[in-house]
Design a protein with these regions (language model features):
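C-terminal interaction-tip segments
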Residues: 1-29, 33, 90-113
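Short beta-strand segments
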Residues: 19, 44, 58-62, 72, ...
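Short solvent-exposed strand-capping/beta-turn motif centered on an Asx-Ser/Thr pair
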Residues: 36-41, 92
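Extracellular Ig-like/FN3 beta-sandwich strand-entry sites
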Residues: 43, 82-84, 96
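Hydrophobic beta-strand residues in large extracellular and virion-surface proteins
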Residues: 46-48, 87-89
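Beta-strand signatures of extracellular beta-sandwich domains
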Residues: 47-51, 100-102
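Intrinsically disordered, low-complexity Pro/Gly/Ser/Thr-rich segments with frequent PxxP/GP/PP motifs
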Residues: 51-86
Length: 113
């Protein structure tokens, strides 16, 4: 298996759902960390969802509070996500939150004879 560590970052400049990470084709990912920081000096909230390959949306964090000028680690355990699944983030207020996701991408090893 080919394993690669990646990170994805977004500055939430709107209140629209924003794609943070899409698992690549033929890959499983283990999300190790989702860090959210608030940089305006005002408390805010964030919503994080997982969309599966059938377009079903699952709430991971619904209106999660982030303290003023604070940084929060949202995961207490790794999160396994499958090929083509999507992590989306939505800020309650634009231009306050930054999000960094760290993951290990695992691709199946090619077998040759």
């Amino acid at each position: 298996m080919a394993n690669t560590f990646v990170n994805k970052k977004v500055d939430l400049s709107s209140t629209s759902a924003t794609t943070l990470y899409t698992v690549p084709t033929a890959t499983t990912a283990v999300i190790k960390s989702i860090l959210v920081s608030e940089d305006s000096g005002n408390a805010d909230t964030i919503t994080i969802t997982l969309t599966d390959t059938d377009a079903a949306v699952f709430s991971l964090f619904n209106v999660k509070a982030i303290s003023a000028s604070g940084t929060s680690e949202l995961l207490s355990a790794p999160l396994v996500v499958a090929e083509s699944e999507i992590i989306k983030v939505t800020a309650a207020t634009a231009n306050r939150l930054h999000v960094v996701l760290s993951a290990l991408e695992i691709k199946p090893r090619e077998v040759t004879t």
